[in-house]
């Protein structure tokens, strides 16, 4: 099992890092008490092979030595990486001031600056054990997410799921669509008596539409658009991109085009899904 522990001072970007790992398929737990870490990992070991947890100052044991013992208690067969995320005191003060959030140690009657410095001392034991230290002073949220993927996982892009969906305009446009293409101008198998009761998944309809130059060109242009911009979408912290193809009823043209595109992209992209909305109802 691969275990990633995210820690660092409040406001440094721990939540952003954890979300980036969740998008990559990690089972994530936010702000787990350290003394429950062995129990959690033993509980999920049979269900998940990639687990990420975040630990903040509120969940540390009172005795710093206990932290070392807890981490050492974890099975040596597990691959554990500790990531410590931090920023300068001035930047953390600015972030708290802009968001008007209350620092976790503010209840100790400390000023914001004092709380930030005190937090650093309390987190020192886990910072000393860190395998990777990330300074977020000059990073945006998206840059931090990309850095997490690149430094920890050895890849700049998350596993973006590319979804092709067919639909009928008379039933409404899918609300989750990122791109919508209108195929209603293309030759319609509905008006062919032998094809009317078939769908875009049936061979006779595939032959009919595949022999139409305008259909072939339409598919090629969609394919070219998605191929051009897919790398940029992957680097933009996206988990899903849904490409919706619509015709009048969602039975022939849109089904054929969505199915054709999904087959093409399955050869060049690791995670492609296909949905035929009207056929599944």
Swiss-Prot record:
It comes from Alteromonas mediterranea (strain DSM 17117 / CIP 110805 / LMG 28347 / Deep ecotype). The keyword Nucleotide-binding applies. One of its GO terms (molecular function) is GTP binding. Keywords: ATP-binding, GTP-binding, Nucleotide-binding. Pfam families: PapZ_C, RapZ-like_N. This is Nucleotide-binding protein MADE_1004170. HAMAP family: RapZ_like (MF_00636). Coiled coil: none annotated. GTP binds at residues 56-59. It comes from the Bacteria. Displays ATPase and GTPase activities. Belongs to the RapZ-like family.
């Amino acid at each position: 099992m691969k275990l990633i522990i995210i820690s660092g001072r409040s406001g440094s970007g721990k939540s952003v890092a954890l979300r980036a790992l969740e998008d990559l398929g990690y089972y994530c737990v936010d702000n787990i008490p350290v003394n429950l870490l062995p129990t959690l990992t033993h509980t999920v070991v049979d269900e998940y092979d990639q687990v990420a947890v975040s630990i903040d100052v509120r969940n540390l044991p009172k005795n710093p030595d206990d932290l070392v013992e807890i981490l050492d208690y974890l099975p040596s067969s597990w691959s554990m990486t500790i990531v410590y995320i931090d920023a300068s005191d001035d930047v953390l003060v600015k972030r708290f001031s802009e968001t008007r959030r209350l620092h976790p140690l503010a209840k100790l009657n400390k000023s914001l600056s004092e709380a930030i410095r005190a937090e650093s001392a309390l987190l020192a034991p886990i910072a000393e054990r860190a395998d990777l230290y990330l300074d977020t002073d000059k990073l945006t949220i998206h840059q931090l997410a990309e850095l997490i993927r690149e430094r920890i996982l050895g890849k700049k892009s998350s596993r973006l799921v590319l979804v092709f969906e067919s639909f009928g305009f008379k039933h409404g446009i899918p609300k989750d669509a990122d791109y919508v293409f209108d195929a209603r101008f293309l030759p319609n198998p509905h008006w062919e008596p032998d094809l009317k009761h078939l769908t875009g998944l049936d061979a006779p309809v595939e032959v009919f539409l595949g022999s139409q130059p305008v259909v072939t060109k339409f598919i090629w242009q969609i394919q070219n658009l998605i191929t051009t911009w897919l790398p940029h979408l992957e680097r933009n912290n996206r988990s899903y991109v849904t490409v919706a193809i619509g015709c009048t009823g969602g039975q022939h043209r849109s089904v054929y085009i969505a199915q054709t595109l999904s087959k093409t992209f399955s050869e060049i992209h690791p995670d492609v899904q296909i949905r035929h909305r009207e056929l599944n109802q």
